[in-house]
Amino acid sequence: MPVGAPINESHQILTKAIGWGRGGGHLDGLKAVGDRLRGLKKDGTYNRGFTAFAVVYLNKVPKPYCGNFTVWPESHRVFEQHFIEHGHEILDDHMPHVVMPEPPIHITGDPGDVVLAHHQLVHTGAPNISSNIRYAVIFRSKGVLCEEVGFDAFTDIWKEWDGIREVIHKARSN
């Protein structure tokens, strides 16, 4: 985005503790989330309006259960396969219940630390049982091919990531 360009996206400020909800994380842009601030389109359908997102910690998050940004490793690949088998259209109804290969990881960090995550990585905010408020800023970036690739990225997660595609191709060739 050019410097000085107007920002047309909504901003998100969470003012209450985030729990585990249905016992797991989520993908942004689904009805289960229920608000446009996290990517739900105005017409109520699911959306993939960004390529990756960044979470920037503004204060120290020293250990688990401090409101940590929490991710399920490999979930982007698990959901890629799930959407290949069942279609991404199931997202219009709900967040699919899929068994994750690994437990969630509470990401710890210091002020200024940045976590970059793929749009299809299952994530949430962990409960915060510490006496400190967890402050973070979340950015969603839209790659230049995001709109062109559209929903195809659900079943080909690296479709708009040329550099990553090349690395994966080379690794599989060896």
PLM-predicted stretches and their roles:
Residues 1-68:
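Conserved double-stranded beta-helix
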Residues 15-17, 39, 80, 86, ...:
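Alpha-helix termini
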Residues 16, 72-79, 140-146:
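Short edge-strand/loop segments of extracellular domains
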Residues 27-39, 85-103, 152-156:
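Short, surface-exposed loop/helix-turn segments at secondary-structure junctions
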Residues 48-51, 59-122:
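Double-stranded beta-helix
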Residues 84-90, 97, 111-116, 120-174:
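Non-heme Fe(II)/2-oxoglutarate
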